[in-house]
């Protein structure tokens, strides 16, 4: 009598299916390229703008202005909108956990669209995590202010935000495609 497949055997089968050659090579190339570009830009912008930050991050410095975006440099010990600034352990945990979950989903992704957006999410979160870890003060450097707003973001925050929007739109497109196929 055949044994029923266990949870782990099903999981292994899904992992192997989602990571077969040559798809795996394209997947890894996309992940490494997008991840490198995001982390490189995060740290290049930090290096370029770190000297512009006010003393201990208390005062921001207005670096450049345009009609769409301004560069205003400030340190931020919290997550988005300076939430949890007084709980650094929770901030590290949330950013690390978000990165781990995103990287976990990458293992099972078979769509280049999802791979791109999940990679952008994972490395945006990792960019903030490593930025905070290497800053010496436990803060990220925020510098983008979009017109009509008062909130200050960095490139990693933008990657996280755009990846959630991209994933949502990808899910909607896939949902409507599947709905259309079931009707015909």
From Swiss-Prot:
From which organism does this entry originate?
A: Mycoplasma pneumoniae (strain ATCC 29342 / M129 / Subtype 1)
- Catalytic residues of the enzyme: 142, 157
- What residues form the membrane-spanning segments? 23-43, 88-108, 110-130, 156-176
Membrane-related topology note: Multi-pass membrane protein
Q: What is this protein called?
A: Lipoprotein signal peptidase
Subcellular location(s): the record lists: Cell membrane
What UniProt keywords are attached to this protein's entry? Answer: Aspartyl protease, Cell membrane, Hydrolase, Membrane, Protease, Transmembrane, Transmembrane helix
Does Transmembrane helix show up as a keyword for this record? yes
């Amino acid at each position: 009598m055949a044994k029923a497949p266990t949870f782990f055997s099903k999981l292994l089968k899904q992992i192997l299916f989602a990571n077969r050659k040559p798809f795996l090579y394209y997947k890894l190339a996309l992940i490494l390229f997008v991840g490198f570009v995001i982390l490189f830009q995060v740290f290049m912008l930090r290096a370029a703008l770190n000297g512009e930050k006010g003393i201990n991050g208390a005062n921001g410095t207005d670096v450049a202005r345009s009609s769409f975006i301004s560069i205003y440099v400030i340190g931020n010990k919290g997550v988005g909108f300076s939430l949890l600034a007084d709980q650094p352990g929770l901030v590290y945990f949330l950013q690390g956990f978000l990165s781990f979950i995103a990287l976990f989903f990458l293992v099972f992704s078979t769509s280049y669209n999802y791979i791109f957006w999940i990679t952008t999410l994972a490395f945006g979160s990792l960019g903030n995590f490593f930025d905070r870890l290497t800053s010496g003060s436990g803060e990220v450097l925020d510098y983008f202010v979009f017109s009509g707003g008062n909130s200050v973001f960095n490139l990693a925050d933008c990657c996280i935000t755009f990846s959630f929007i991209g994933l949502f739109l990808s899910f909607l497109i896939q949902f409507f495609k599947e709905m259309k196929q079931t009707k015909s």
